[in-house]
Amino acid sequence: MEALVYTFLLVGTLGIIFFAIFFREPPRIVK
């Protein structure tokens, strides 16, 4: 169960960093 929690936290942190970089730059993909 601990491994599942660690993987969840890892994916969560990576997701937050990805969204931070994505929203920081102008979203060209939408247009």
Swiss-Prot record:
Summary of the function given for this chain in its UniProt record: Found at the monomer-monomer interface of the photosystem II (PS II) dimer, plays a role in assembly and dimerization of PSII. PSII is a light-driven water plastoquinone oxidoreductase, using light energy to abstract electrons from H(2)O, generating a proton gradient subsequently used for ATP formation.
Predominant subcellular localization, coarse grouping: plastid
By its UniProt entry, which Pfam families does this protein fall under? PsbT
Fetch the HAMAP family from UniProt.
PSII_PsbT
- Could you state one GO cellular component term attached to this entry? photosystem II reaction center
What is this organism's lineage?
Answer: Eukaryota, Viridiplantae, Chlorophyta, core chlorophytes, Trebouxiophyceae
Presence of the UniProt keyword Thylakoid in the record: yes
Query: Which gene does this sequence derive from?
Result: psbT
Name assigned to this protein: Photosystem II reaction center protein T
- SUPFAM superfamilies with a match to the protein in the record: Photosystem II reaction center protein T, PsbT
Does Plastid show up as a keyword for this record?
Answer: yes
Where are the bilayer-spanning segments?
3-23
| Domain of life of the organism encoding this protein | Eukaryota
GO biological process terms, alphabetically, are: photosynthesis
What is this entry's stated membrane topology?
Single-pass membrane protein
User: Where does this polypeptide localize?
Assistant: Plastid, Chloroplast thylakoid membrane
The alphabetized UniProt keywords are: Chloroplast, Membrane, Photosynthesis, Photosystem II, Plastid, Thylakoid, Transmembrane, Transmembrane helix
Species in which this protein is naturally found:
Chlorella vulgaris (Green alga)
User: Its family?
Assistant: Belongs to the PsbT family.
> Can you state the subunit structure given in the record?
PSII is composed of 1 copy each of membrane proteins PsbA, PsbB, PsbC, PsbD, PsbE, PsbF, PsbH, PsbI, PsbJ, PsbK, PsbL, PsbM, PsbT, PsbY, PsbZ, Psb30/Ycf12, at least 3 peripheral proteins of the oxygen-evolving complex and a large number of cofactors. It forms dimeric complexes.
Check the record and name the InterPro entries matching this protein: PSII_PsbT, PSII_PsbT_sf
